[in-house]
């Protein structure tokens, strides 16, 4: 019978990352209409004052979103702690129930056995 050992696949070595000079050369050589440069560029017909107001509004929106996120995160942590406590309580109740069932079984079995023998 042949060995069923799995052959290990040897991957080629990872190429070295580009140097800063290579990155700069690549960026300088890219055309201005390259999607990398145009994807984030927004046309703003309002002019410079509109940009300032938009930036301020965006900062405010991000601030409020951050506050909502932090509040929600705190609520989730509290809910997680409450669930953990409830889980522990249920586990303890289950263990007590198992003990009670076991005690009832031990009490009921001897009397049943004696009645069936007599």
From Swiss-Prot:
Pfam families: UPF0449 (PF15136). This is UPF0449 protein C19orf25 homolog. InterPro entries: UPF0449. Keywords: Coiled coil, Phosphoprotein. Belongs to the UPF0449 family. The modification Phosphotyrosine is found at residue 63. Residues 69-105 form a coiled coil. The keyword Phosphoprotein applies. It comes from the Eukaryota. Transmembrane segments: none annotated.
